[in-house]
Amino acid sequence: MKKSSIIDVPRKHDQEDLFGIERYQEALSEFIRNADTPLTIALQGEWGSGKTSLMNALRFSLCDSDKAPFYGIWLNTWQYSLLSTPEQTLIRIIEGLTNKIIEIIKEKHQNKAEAFAKTAMRFFKKASVEIAKIGADKLISGGKDVIGALSSSDEKEILLNDFRDELQKSINELIKYEEEKATGKNGILFFIDDLDRIDPPVAVQILELLKNIFDLENCIFILAIDYDVVIKGLKPKFGELTDKNEREFRSFFDKIIQLPFSCQWQVIRLKRS
């Protein structure tokens, strides 16, 4: 029996490419293979435009295939936000990324992973307290900056820097090990999905956290987020978008994103049977 319904499920790498994504995936994969780090790429497009499908293809090509050059870490931000306050969402995402990194490092350097985990625990304990102090209302209204709260004193600044330094050292040692073993692995690719399903002001806070904490050598972030979501998320801070303040919105986006990549495919091919 033939079926004729349309489902909203991202394309897997081994499914037929009805949207013509493959040529874009190949070009972007080649760019990523040769890119300097750190780097953040934004896959832009409306919800349902194929951002997750493209990320699936990139993950298979660059992380899961034979002799893939990157470790891959996938994080669905919307799932982390379920049944969580905005403050809890931010902490859960930082912890989620960090734990996934620790899992990779632990395979090669058990002692290094344990040492970094201790530093991470101290940071999470303090960060949870400081972010909770901000409160959901101020997070959503843009009245308080998360990174500012985490580095508003010498003690907090040292704690944040220690976390970043230990994370960078651990990743560098992992890549050095891979080079010595000639495995072909030379970095970590982070796939951050479904940011456009989160409340826009919270999504903007997540972007700032990623930039200030995880902007590291040997790391490339691929974000599924549209510029319109960033605009909505920045309205509490900058007001309605106008010709006069458009530069402020664009400057924030450009500060976070080095390569915007549009997923508005010019040709959509639907196979009819």
Describe the predicted segments one by one.
Residues 155-232, 237:
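Conserved Walker B catalytic segment
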Residues 39, 104-108, 178, 182, ...:
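Short, flexible/disordered secondary-structure transition segments
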Residues 243-273:
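Conserved P-loop NTPase catalytic core
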Residues 50, 81-82, 197-199, 229-233, ...:
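Flexible loop/turn segments at secondary-structure boundaries
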